[in-house]
Curated annotation (Swiss-Prot):
One of its GO terms (molecular function) is 4 iron, 4 sulfur cluster binding. Its main location: cytoplasm. Residues 3-118 form the MTTase N-terminal domain. It comes from the Bacteria. It is found in: Cytoplasm. This is Ribosomal protein uS12 methylthiotransferase RimO. It catalyses: L-aspartate(89)-[ribosomal protein uS12]-hydrogen + (sulfur carrier)-SH + AH2 + 2 S-adenosyl-L-methionine = 3-methylsulfanyl-L-aspartate(89)-[ribosomal protein uS12]-hydrogen + (sulfur carrier)-H + 5'-deoxyadenosine + L-methionine + A + S-adenosyl-L-homocysteine + 2 H(+). InterPro entries: Elp3/MiaA/NifB-like_rSAM, Methylthiotransferase, Methylthiotransferase_CS, Methylthiotransferase_N, Methylthiotransferase_N_sf, NA-bd_OB-fold, Ribosomal_uS12_MeSTrfase_RimO, rSAM.
Amino acid sequence: MAGKIGFVSLGCPKALVDSELILTQLSAEGYKTAKDYSGADLVVVNTCGFIDSAVEESLSAIGEALAENGKVIVTGCLGARKNADGSDLIHSIHPKVLAVTGPHATDEVMQVIHLHLPKPHDLYTDLVPSARVRLTPKHYAYLKISEGCNHRCTFCIIPNLRGDLVSRPIGDVLLEVKRLFESGVKELLVVSQDTSAYGVDIQYRTGFWDGKPVKTKMFDLVNTLNQIAREHQAWVRLHYVYPYPHVDDILPLMAEFAEHGYGVLPYLDIPLQHAHPDVLKKMKRPASGEKNLERILAWREACPDLVIRSTFIAGFPGETEGEFEYLLNFLDEAQIDRAGCFAYSPVDGATANELANPVPDQIREDRRARLMAKAEEISVGRLAKKIGKRLQVIIDRVDDHGGIGRTIGDAPEIDGLVRVLPANKPSKRYRAGEIIRVTVISSQGHDLIAET
């Protein structure tokens, strides 16, 4: 009889892909997924360990799984965290867990599952190649192209948790892309810790795809993704793109999107974090504020439809009021379409904790609120310019009031939405995953209202 596994997935899209890989292997080996703890033979919790709130959420989820089930395997970023004395953090708080692994550890997790719940042997499922299990809606999927990061930003401990950059072979990546599109995916979201650095660790080694040589390099990857996506009338969205000079090369591909309607979207998720040169230096970020602004303005010139999303940290240690005002001015000049902001929070093990002149909590929160107000002001202004225009929208879900979708400028869960009013013809109903053209009739905050 097949064993049943309960599964909890926490954290970022990269962790979500790790969860999907584990679930795919479980499915291939004949295990079933339980809907609740009581129906599971054991539970796997994929954790996040980046910021304090994520650590608390992960520890709480582990505790709940132990209380409800008793047999728990922990994996993910929090599994790599240690106490000051070098002991395992999770075992010190939850000593009854069966095992703890770090991130991207499918093989290790499966070994522990086999130990406590031997896999059902099936002559056929043991031989059939697995199809990837996904936790997202059927019409979009995350594509992880690399693991780890070579940067040593002072506020971040991800390299300690996930290691240095390891790029996936480009042939493997493109094969996964083809299979995802053939399974019905209409939007592919490329994720990593540093998408722009793809291939650096292996000196841009030449791989093969469709019988042709292709370099393990950002431009070559994006160019090929663009071609495959057009063939399948689908979208590709790029996340975690650092503003290196070679990113300039992909802007012409994005500028072509308006002509084709499919391919690589004119959308860049860029983790800028700040704009003032002195703050960026303390953060040990790989680019300067002046160059970032210059590059963004050049990108907008090359691709007028470009949408830029970014995240920022307010109240970093030593940040002055003048430096924060500089950041607000940067948002205005760069016209960042979508922005998120975190008030700086000390992360255990981050070297930024040792910096002088920490900013008081209240000032940190005040600056975060001010930045978000500025971001909303910019976003609302840019969305207002879309009223009356025809736009493409991908439908995420359908209800009695029409459809809920997203434009090319909206990534799932983190950006805005489009409420598409019911079609004029009663017989016409939208379908999840359908890409349609709409006319924008109004805006509400970060969202749009449209009709077909």
